[in-house]
């Protein structure tokens, strides 16, 4: 989880800047958890840039991995717009958005709250796909394997061609 010192930050920072705060191993682990591969032989800055471009190019990598509550949280970020912090009660376990370094978090320990800020480029990448991801999660609550996703895509394709 990437923490910030106050809520004066604006959301016009880049995802690669968030990744640069992490170690190279942490970045590789994030991408591995999303069932993708990134070479561990790259320099840290290149690893951060490549990981950010993978997520921004295919936001469904992340959206398919989130549970329904976190997808609703992403929808809140999308609807809130730029420079808007989403406030949640602190939990023992961070959200996946925090674990994957997709938000910067200010920890208000007195109020026991997290003030989360999502970079504009991440919010804009998620925006066109969030409703589809929520509908998909309603239909298939558990995470699907690559084989199951392929079968669903094939069935959808066949159904469209038979109509």
Which residues does each PLM region occupy?
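Interaction-mediating elements
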Residues: 149, 155-157
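Basic helix-extension-helix modules of the SAP/HeH family
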Residues: 1-142, 152
């Amino acid at each position: 989880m990437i923490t910030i010192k106050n809520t004066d930050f604006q959301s016009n920072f880049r995802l690669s800047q968030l990744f640069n705060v992490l170690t190279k191993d942490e970045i590789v682990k994030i991408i591995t958890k999303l069932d993708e591969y990134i070479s561990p032989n790259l320099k840290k800055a290149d690893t951060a840039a490549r990981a950010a471009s993978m997520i921004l190019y295919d936001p469904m990598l992340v959206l398919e991995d989130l549970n329904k509550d976190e997808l609703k949280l992403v929808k809140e970020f999308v609807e809130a717009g730029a420079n808007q912090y989403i406030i949640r009660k602190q939990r023992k376990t961070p959200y996946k958005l925090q674990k994957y370094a997709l938000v910067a978090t200010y920890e208000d320990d007195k109020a026991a709250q997290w003030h989360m800020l999502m970079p504009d480029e991440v919010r804009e990448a998620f925006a066109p796909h969030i409703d589809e991801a929520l509908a998909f999660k309603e239909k298939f609550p558990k995470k699907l394997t690559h084989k199951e996703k392929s079968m669903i895509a094939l069935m959808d394709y066949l159904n469209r061609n038979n109509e």
